[in-house]
A protein has these predicted regions:
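Short, positively charged and aromatic/hydrophobic N-terminal segments
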Residues: 14, 21, 25-28, 40
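Conserved Radical SAM active-site core
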Residues: 40-177, 185-189, 199, 203-204, ...
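Short beta-strand/loop segments at the ligand-binding rim of alpha/beta enzyme cores
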Residues: 212-220
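Conserved small/polar residues in nucleotide/adenosyl-binding loops
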Residues: 224-225
């Protein structure tokens, strides 16, 4: 019996009322009716969410780890004040403050996924593939489903425990690494720095992933003030 993890055929998220209007992406208004601008209100903050079509979600990586980089989203609602990825605004044309916008990528099915056998695929180099909106849009899960059955090496960078949802898929890959970043153990300070899940939830998720036999990494990005 199959299990459905994500909503399909429904664009309304569980935590807000929104309106949808056409928007100009890279200076033009796409013809695809799926490409829309959505304004969500959550915790008294306004976040602008767009659904966009991209030709290819895989990008040859220039990172030291090599392989390919995959970012199922542009932007990140975790809104970390120290986030290095905010430089991406220079290339995407966003004028909104970092953490207040999110582009949800829709891509064509990956052609011949076995061409990535033996390749390292880093998920979340300039976004977090498991931010709260992933619970409904499921773009990261879709990517893992498309790569299922390959010998690709999967490396996930996140601050979220939502990755536990995809444990069934992750255990199907021969080589998987899940890396969490932690900047402090002071929860009050953490709340001021980012909108990700609590440090306690991250540590509990690390333990569950580790106990499932998956290589687990904790990246300590300490903040000095």
């Amino acid at each position: 019996m199959s299990t459905s993890y994500c909503r399909t055929g429904e664009k309304k998220l569980y935590f807000g009322i929104y309106e949808r209007i056409p928007f100009a992406y890279n200076g033009r208004i796409p013809n695809d009716s799926r490409t829309t601008e959505t304004i969500y209100r959550k915790n008294m903050e306004k976040e602008i969410i767009r659904e966009i079509d991209v030709q290819n979600v895989m990008t040859k990586s220039s990172l030291p780890v090599g392989g390919f980089s995959v970012n199922p989203y542009v932007g990140c609602p975790h809104a970390c004040k120290y986030c290095y990825a905010s430089f991406m605004k220079r290339f995407t044309g966003h004028t909104e403050p970092w953490g207040t916008f999110l582009d949800v990528k829709h891509w064509k099915p990956i052609d011949n996924p076995h061409k990535y056998d033996g390749q390292r695929i880093v998920i979340g180099s300039v976004t977090d593939g498991y931010h709260p909106y992933e619970e409904d849009f499921c773009r990261t899960r879709k990517l893992l489903e498309e790569l299922k059955g390959t010998n690709a090496e999967i490396m996930i960078c996140t601050k979220s425990d939502l990755v536990l949802r995809d444990l069934d898929l992750l255990k199907g890959f021969q080589k998987v690494t899940v890396s969490w970043s932690v900047n402090t153990l002071d929860e009050q300070f953490r709340c001021d720095m980012d909108r990700a899940v609590s440090i306690e939830r991250r540590l509990k998720a690390m333990k569950q992933i580790y106990n499932a036999g998956i290589r687990t990494v904790c990246f300590l990005s300490l903040i000095h003030i």
